[in-house]
Design a protein with these regions (language model features):
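N-terminal secretory targeting modules
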Residues: 1-82, 268, 272-288
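A short helix->loop->beta-strand "cap" motif at the edges of active sites that frequently abuts
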Residues: 181-183
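Catalytic His-Asp segment of secreted/periplasmic serine-dependent ester chemistry enzymes
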Residues: 194-288
């Protein structure tokens, strides 16, 4: 009896070899196609990022208003020391009057709640990222001891694609140093960048996901380091999504006076709790 070559071991091997080769070819083609798609996506995202920078520009400049002073001075008594660190939101870029900045709004509202003056000191710098926080701390004068420190940072970490672990590391470091001064710390987590209408899709969707993830990491980091986090995405994000014309300033990136008001209102309960804890504890005598 003759056996057809296709059913001999050699024939089987050839068939398997042909199938294996075809499979490898398909995988290679799929991989090449995916690489092309990813390359196209990368080019599109780079182009969209450049478009976003052109759209937003810098109509507000890079200098925020100086709101540092004693607020609610007429209430009398020893002022509460309020320190603000972070990026352009913390610095108040976009506010047209100093009383509209985030720090000033927090100082005024906290003073009213506690019925005492509040001395505001702002070391936040426009354009800052989380790795800049330690240098902001280092800029404090010798012997300065804040009762409460507020940190708002993260947007530039996302737009400049900083690794979240790096952002968390520097946030943890500055919280630890502030806590070492017996300061109570409040952290406003990264806002949802999906609210930025000036950013085209799909870049806006990607930025939204990245900012949400960073906010989660910031909240966990803050709690572990002894600070109280405030989820700004949940607290004020819907307002920025629903009323962008009112909540954003003319650059469509930074908050307007109303945007800062709503952000301060979201932070205020945590700031007041922090102030009450600090005021009820003995102040350290030693300097930094």
């Amino acid at each position: 009896m003759r056996v057809h070559a296709a059913f001999t071991p050699t024939g089987c091997n050839r068939g398997v070899s042909r199938i294996g080769t075809a499979f490898v070819v398909r995988i290679a083609l799929a991989g090449a196609a995916l690489a092309v798609v990813l390359g196209v996506v990368r080019v599109v995202l780079v182009q969209q990022a450049a478009l976003t920078r052109r759209r937003i520009g810098k109509p507000l400049g890079e200098d925020s208003l100086d709101a540092d002073r004693v607020w609610r001075r007429s209430l009398g008594g020893e002022p509460l020391e309020l320190l603000v660190l972070g990026d352009s939101i913390a610095a108040g870029l976009g506010a047209e009057r100093r009383k509209e900045t985030l720090g000033a709004r927090l100082a005024k509202a906290t003073g009213r709640r506690l019925q005492r003056p509040v001395r505001l000191r702002t070391v936040a710098v426009v354009g800052s990222e989380s790795p800049d926080l330690p240098s902001q701390f280092d800029a404090l004068p010798e012997g300065y001891l804040p009762h409460v420190a507020v940190i708002v940072v993260g947007g530039n970490d996302v737009t400049h694609r900083l690794p979240p672990a790096l952002s968390a590391q520097h946030l943890h470091e500055v919280i630890r140093r502030l806590r070492g001064m017996d300061a109570e710390v409040v952290v406003g987590t990264c806002p949802d960048l999906g609210a930025l209408r000036a950013v085209p899709q799909p870049l806006r969707r990607i930025a939204s996901g990245l900012s949400r993830r960073l906010a989660e990491i910031q909240a966990e980091t803050a709690r572990r380091a002894g600070a109280e986090p405030v989820d700004l995405r949940r607290a004020v994000g819907p307002m920025f999504f629903d009323e962008p014309e009112a909540m954003f300033s003319l650059d469509r990136f930074h908050p307007s006076a109303l945007g800062y008001r709503r952000t301060a209102e979201a932070l205020l309960p945590a700031v007041c709790r922090a102030a009450e804890r600090s005021l009820s504890s003995p102040r350290p005598q030693e300097t930094r």
